[in-house]
Amino acid sequence: MEKKTVTVKILGKTREYPMGITYAEIVKEYEGATKYPIVLVMKDGKLRELHKRLKQDGTLEFITTADEIGHKTYKRSAILLLLKALYNVAGHDKIKKAVIHYAVSSGYYVTVDGDVAITEDFLLKVKEYMLELVEKKIPVMKRSVGTDEAISLFHKHKMYDKENLFRYRRVSRVNIYSIEEFEDYFYGFMVHHTGYIKYFDLYPYDDGFVLQLPERKDPEIVPAFEPHQKIFQIGRAHV
């Protein structure tokens, strides 16, 4: 007889769930049980995104934005959200490429190559659109595609730098993440939906701007941007 339930140990207690339930559904039951939002789970020592399904008995641990891998997941997801908003506000045809260069302060230095003026007004529109997406709790979708399909995908979206990158990469599969119609390649985990990405700010800086994010020690507070010019110049020299 086919097994219809799965038994797992969570926070020291044994629970039983229907076979194939998503981790997101389980996590919903534990809202408020952790100080910070649960963005991933650890199933028997292996990290899993929340859209994945529980299929075997075992032990389940929660990963929040205060954990190292959870914090990295939050930052990576914030970058995807930012890129979606950038292309939407500026218009796809106006951007040749948007580049996340390196960490500066507690965020990332970003430049945009194209017919786009990075002004405070423009960044305000981008931020407002990002907050709209957060409010809607749009699913962050993941799919694995072959390299040839990824090349065609980036060509269609006019992301020619990434198209060229994958022409010379010897990998068989590529993880593509999307928010609505916007798609991009990322290596690493993402949050389940845009509603998790509540904390960020945008600051115009030098030839681009900074996506300012919380630090791991306080994952729901966005610190004020305090540029360290020496560190910035060292980072810029490697761009």
What do the predicted segments below correspond to?
Residues 52-55, 59-73, 85, 94-105, ...:
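Auxiliary tRNA-acceptor-end handling modules of aminoacyl-tRNA synthetases
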